[in-house]
Amino acid sequence: MVNIRSNENIPYPAYERICNRGFSHANRLYDFNRVKYPLKRATWSIEEPHVENRGSDEWERLSWDEAAKLVADTLKYNTENYGARSNLFLCSAGNSFGVYGGSFTGNSFANVNGYTTLDVCLDYGDLHGIGQVTGGGWDFNQRNMSGDYRFAKTLFIWDTNPPNSQPHNWHFCIEAKEAGSNLVVIDPTYTVAASQATKWVPIKPGTDPALGMAILNVVIANEWYDTDFLREKTCAPLLVREDNGHFLRSTDFGEDGPAQLPEYPFYGMLLLQASKANKVPTLEQTADYVVWDADANARGAINETANPALEGRYEVDGVKVTTAWTLLKEHMAECTPEWAEKITEVPADTIVELARMYAQDAPSTIYAGYHLYDNCEVMGMTWATMAAITGNIGKKGASIGHLGKDKPYLNRTPDLFPNGLTGLANDIPWLALNEILETGQYLGKEFPVRLLYNVGA
């Protein structure tokens, strides 16, 4: 490797810049301690692995052909003697899409052969939280392309420092500011990003959910929400049963309806139009969800009711229900700016101004970091709910998340499942692996582990 430079042939010159991880490849390639050749533990064989000798630091060098054959023979031996699921594949990490990454090929190989894949249980708080509201994972709940920032009138950079962590994206933020956008940085530290902000908001570490909920409180109290967006593109008008907290469905009354629809026992905004995301029902399936028809003063199906009520409590065939929007408003009523000030150390009047900027100086985008605090999934839910009630999602200049659509996560399904869903791999959480190795069981059933195929992690 002589030099690292960006792809000069891409159609969008603004995306030619390289991230820090890309620049680090030369150091990784020429690192003194890098393993450069295939190695096998000296006493190891497929039939007799001699696990007691692990840690002995005694190795035998193999040729690449020998190594490939050994892996193939081991996979075959394990499949024939212990079942395909005994081969575990871990093919995901920060290097998954770089020069040394193998996420696509490794997971595709596991899926085709019915091996077990390990879910690495990434502690991306905002990713999991946003996904609880919008549905889906990598493929849906992320912000627009970075070049879209210039269309945002307000850009929140929340607990991340792009000049250091994502310098290839930072210029988009500066260009948005130069175009007239409000550049708001929320961060406990006066970072490089904060030094360039229109407004810097220091906050007590770990208290971001309280700030977000107070912003929701202000938006709701001042009626700065987007009523049409709430009614047409979120779960706000859906009726929630008081007895079990689930959405009311026509099948609750013995009527025919789609089977096995997912439950969403939370008060946030489910974007019904995201029907192609991993966990969100299709538009046809949502016919099972029930709303209150404000014109007919009776219950109706979500896809057949032109004017569903956003607020109110009702009784449907003896079942007491409340709209999801009413529940959200009631839940946020206690989260006043004064309440949040005591927790976050952000002045109440600053919180009101943040809410006004986000809801009124729209379209607005939230550019977030990974958020690794143990309460950050709540922050992700809060961001998504902020976006949903103000209509700041799915539009030019309006989105949420830490990975943009200019990243390679979009539409990777054909690569992971080249033959469709035939031979789909088992999947277990990484956090359960120790217990599986110790007990040989998973969820109370026998689960042998004979091989861990680790790529880029």
Residue ranges and their predicted role:
Residues 318-319, 326-337, 406:
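Conserved, charged catalytic cores of large soluble enzymes
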Residues 342:
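Active-site-adjacent helical/loop segments in soluble small-molecule enzymes
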Residues 113, 219, 332, 358, ...:
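Generic structural signal for hydrophobic core residues of well-folded globular domains
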